[in-house]
Amino acid sequence: MSDKERERERSQSRERSRTRERSRTRDSKRDHSDSRSLRRRSYRGDRSRSPSRSRSRSYSPSRSPRRKRRRHRTSRRSRRSRREGDGRRKDGPRGHDDRSPLAPREVEDVTVKREDSTNDKESTHDKESTNDKERNVSMEDRKDTSEDVVEDVEEGDPSEEALEKKVKNPEDDLEAAAEELKKLMELKSGGRYVPPAKIRALQKLLVQDKTSKEFQKIQFDNLKKAINSLVNKVSAQNIRDIAGEIFTHNLIRGRGLFCRSVMTAQSLALPYTPVYACLTAIVNSKLPQVGELLVRRLILQFRRGYKRNQKDVCLSSVTFLAHLCNYHVAHEVLVLQLLHLLLETPTDHSVEVAVAFIKESGAFLAEVSPAANNGVFERLRAVLHDGELEKRTQYMIETLFQIRKDGYENYPVVQEELDLVDEEDYVTHMTGLDDKFTDDKLLNYFVMDPDYEANEEKYDLLKKEILGDSDDEEEDDSEAEEEADDEEEEEGDEEEEAQASTSAVRDLTGTELATLRKKIYLTVMSTMSIDEIVHKLVKLSRTVIEIPEGLPEDQALILRLKRTQEVTNMLVECCAQEKIYNKIYGGTGERLLRLSREWRTNFENTFGFFYSVIHRYEPNQIRNIATFFGYLLASDSLSWKVLEAVSLTEEDSNPSNRIFLKIMFTEMRQELGMDLLKERLSKPFVQQYIAGMFPKTNASHVRFAINYFTAINLGPLTDGMREILPGLVEEEERLKKEEEEQKREYDSYDSYDSYDSYDSYDSYDSYDSYDSYDSYDSYDSYDSYDSYDSYDSVSEDDRGRRRRRGVGSRRRSLTRSPGSRSRPRSRPRSRSRSRSLSRDRTGSPPRGRRRSRSYSRSPSRSYSRSRSYSRSPSPRPKSKGAKGRSSYRAASYSRSRSPVRRVGYSRSRSPSVSGGSSRSPSRSPCRSPNKGRAPTPEKGLSPPRKRVRASDLF
């Protein structure tokens, strides 16, 4: 055992012994008091049983007062004896009559009995206490140890060092310290007392490891306490300081704690709701996820309260939501949904909650959506005239009408001292009453974060961005004040120039454009009828847009067109945000298109813009946008010219574009019908605009368009393309063949002169390698065909026959002639080899001599078979004489893209007909077609050289 373990055991034994001593001291004191009470009882009993007092035990009413006085006197004597101590108590009770002969003897007997009973009780109690200590030694040791620790700390013992020693030295093992802390926290949560000093000591040890779960738990508890403290301290006077201080804590991690603290504080103090709403708006402007979570939880809280008929819960929830709408944290659509739910089936409680809701948000609703506000008050007037509510509720409605008449003087939208958020920093959440979401209760509790340090660093950067602006502004203000004291006049001039330049820059930036978009969005979303939306949008496009003074007319016109374009873009954006397509948007677009040509141009540009970026939207948004434009096209409000931007090909389209077109054409078919839609698309002035969707020139594009429209159940629209598709396919095949033939001719003519290098006689020795082609026995299978009987080997006797047929052979050919009609695959061969030189200067194929190699096997009947091996592809002959097997069969093997001209080799059973030297060069080029072999022109050795086309030979 180590020294530390021995020291730990000794300290534990000392603590146990000290615990036993204290327990014995307490037991002895308790037994001493019991013995004194026993002594008093025994003393009175002995005196009552004495012979002199035996007669007093009989009942006598006259003696009862004396008995009471005697008891009272005895009790006084016992109290005096307890005050005087044990030493005088042994001599007998004070005030006893020593002259009585029974007194000393009775006192001695009582003393003996007292001592015996005391000893017996002490021994019995010691045994019981020992057993109890053995059974519960762990819990008693912990409790007594904690008490000793607290006593030592209070007496002035150094708490840090002493406490660490007495808590079993958890620094040696952090895991043991964590387990000990866990046990203590469980005891504390179960109602047991745990010294805070002991918990702090363990926590201090665990703080050293920042990746541990205990450290994160401690930090989470500290975060909860800090947020709760700041929320409880906030007021209208210190909200600026509290808002800056609350950002120093990690609100992303503690957003659930913040929402819970704010909701709890607001429900307990409804008059402070504007303060909590302002604090939430400040946090929401920098961290929108916090504001969204709070809105969701308030909606869920209202739902639960409404289902359970809890008026207080509903009242606190709608009050908070009303002020959040005033600060643009929640949208006014949520206000209208709540009022519709409360006034749909009016009761006393629902009307009371609705009245309180309208008091807080009535001014905001009248400013943003006056039509909806009027509808709400009309509903309240109808409820009031029904007279089914209590008098108290009716009086509340009448009071609300009076408040509205006074212009909500006591219920402003935002109080002046709480107007701390700029309009540009508003972040509005489109959360509806019927949306499906959760309150994320897990955020209220601790969850270990594996990336704790990384997330903390990220929030530190975010905190610097949020709080750094205010620090910079304060520094700038202080510097400006110092400079103002020194140079007031110069700085005044600079400020004027800066303001002038700033105003000019602000007019040309997107700040006003963003404000315009917000106004358009709020106008469209809060208006109930088409006429009202059109009127407000036209008014916004004319009055709200301010053109900077001094701007040239052309630039002012461009700026105005750009900003009016935003009206149409925002109308389509609002339509895309809807969960289900609303026909109000289609009617609004139709009305705007019929106002002027400017609106038509704007919508045409809008269609092209949204079609080009449609892949950025979700499927539901694509559906709404496509339905909107489909309705405009079907109603002839939007020009068909917009379809010029559509190119329906596999290369130019993507899945989002195809989905958009499918939904748009489906909407047009629903509005017009298939027959009328087909008639519209077949009109001449429309055909020029839909050429990209219904192509008529490219067969592959036509085929793709036909397949697409057939797949979306719009096959009748492709009847015209189906008619022209076969002609396009034939035309493409014909053009393809012509291109291939032209390419072959071009390649052959370009490589025609490349064979002049064969003038050297010795260069033909390399062609001896063609003898190896005898190994191609696979071609022997052709000998079984009867069609080859008419062909003989190349000899003197069959030249006339070849001349009559008009077929010349100017190439080196390899011919094999079997000994019989069908010969076996393996047979002996005998060959005679000869080489002959032929020169042809006239270029006529049948008359010239040729250089050949003939292999004679036997003089019997043979088949003439010529194999020509070339290094380039051979063109097909165009003449009829080259078709089929009208000439001898030749197999052509292409090795490369080299010219078609080559030297041929012939094998024959008959002797060679050619004369001349056995080894001589030949300049006769040869074109070898694939199947039907046709003679090719020969190039002479002497000038003039003449090029002969293949077509001239047939």
From Swiss-Prot:
UniProt keywords, alphabetically: Cytoplasm, mRNA processing, mRNA splicing, Nucleus, Spliceosome
One Pfam short name: MIF4G
Domain MIF4G positions: 224-407
PROSITE patterns cross-referenced by the UniProt entry: MI
Biased segments, Acidic residues type: 147-161, 468-498
GO terms, biological process: mRNA splicing, via spliceosome
Biased composition (Basic residues): 64-82, 801-814, 822-836
Comp. bias intervals (Low complexity): 749-766, 781-793, 855-873, 885-929
GO molecular function: RNA binding
MI domain: residues covered: 515-648
GO CC entries: catalytic step 2 spliceosome; cytoplasm
Domain of life: Eukaryota
Basic and acidic residues bias: start-end ranges: 1-49, 83-146, 162-171, 733-747
Region (Disordered): 1-172, 467-506, 733-766, 781-954
Cross-referenced SUPFAM superfamilies: ARM repeat
Compartment(s): Cytoplasm; Nucleus
Function: Involved in pre-mRNA splicing.
Subunit architecture: Associated with the spliceosome.
Protein name: Pre-mRNA-splicing factor CWC22
Species for this entry: Yarrowia lipolytica (strain CLIB 122 / E 150) (Yeast)
